[in-house]
């Protein structure tokens, strides 16, 4: 999911066709050639007519029609609805952007034993790559088609329906969403709201021309969550803000790696981010890191795995380890650079250390059963409960939250009037390709 506070811890070208080979000459050219040969044969036949059977006029050959290949190249629809497994029938998905290890980690490129052990992780990586391809195609469509005037509900449901279609998991059958689909709700946080906002049922909020919207969503296969985010604006005045945060995220990706300390990553991110400023309505604003938001590691079916990647200088001496998956994300703000919980809650998840407490409300018991069977430890929102046909569940949900069984994640906001931006990618730290793999 998009963010973790310290307090709580171009479009793929699928249309490429093979270049024409010599036997793929246009039908018209073939017919002209055959016609010329047949005319010559007819003249020779006339000169020796009646002599022998071999001298008889040759029959005019009909040009063979080239049989068309069945199926053709499969392409993605608009909106995206073709499962990526249909687009990549061999099950081999793009690797993503690769960044070579440097310095002391360069040995991973040549170590034969490391390469052998890494190949054993191929199934694990293919699940991540499939989810990454889903995310790439959906976000590319979203970036082209999100426009001012659309409601947030329309935008969120459009993204979520696309993810479900491309993973091949609608999430309507019991347990289906645990197998694949949405890794967490689609966050659409606007302006001073930095993270964890998605519309609840009945929300009428509309995206405006002057808004700065963070789009943060996850796709997963078998619990391998691909968590990536970007920021959309429609006014170039905000370009320096977006450039600052994008630069900071890319810096974090470059600095991260096996055995690197979190404090070093955070210091590099802060230096990159806070070298920018943005002018809004005649006032210069320094871009600040939102110091109580962090990146995080990701475990199977668990979006926040327990480790945090700070985006400011810190004393955290924790190291990244081989085999870990991290969401490297940064947040920049024109405000105070500190977020608090505000607005109506929409995001929830089963608490990792949920207590075993008796539930007296039948609505709470029924809802907990539904959550366990349909979401497990994956985050969900109220709209996801709605689409499963549930109603009048809010009392039970609040009871689960107050009992500590379900954790709520309210929207995280800087001061009103400020603007925030976010960029995020998932990174894998394996000797598997002796690289850092960025989605």
Swiss-Prot record:
Task: List the biased-composition ranges (Basic residues).
Answer: 56-72
Q: Where does a divalent metal cation 1 bind?
A: 216, 227, 424
Ranges of Acidic residues composition bias in the record: 28-41
Gene Ontology cellular component?
Answer: cytoplasm
Pfam families per the UniProt record, alphabetical: Peptidase_M24
Alphabetically ordered keywords of this record:
Aminopeptidase, Cytoplasm, Hydrolase, Metal-binding, Protease
What are the recorded Gene Ontology BP terms? proteolysis
Residues bound to a divalent metal cation 2 are 227, 296, 329, 424
Coiled coil where? none
Query: Which cofactor is recorded for it?
Result: Co(2+); Zn(2+); Mn(2+); Fe(2+)
EC number(s) given by UniProt? 3.4.11.18
Q: InterPro entries, from UniProt?
A: Creatinase/aminopeptidase-like, Met_Aminopeptidase_Type2, Pept_M24, Pept_M24_MAP, Pept_M24A_MAP2, Pept_M24A_MAP2_BS, WH-like_DNA-bd_sf, WH_DNA-bd_sf
In residue numbers, the region (Disordered) covers 1-90
What's the protein name?
Methionine aminopeptidase 2-2
Source organism per entry reads Penicillium rubens (strain ATCC 28089 / DSM 1075 / NRRL 1951 / Wisconsin 54-1255) (Penicillium chrysogenum)
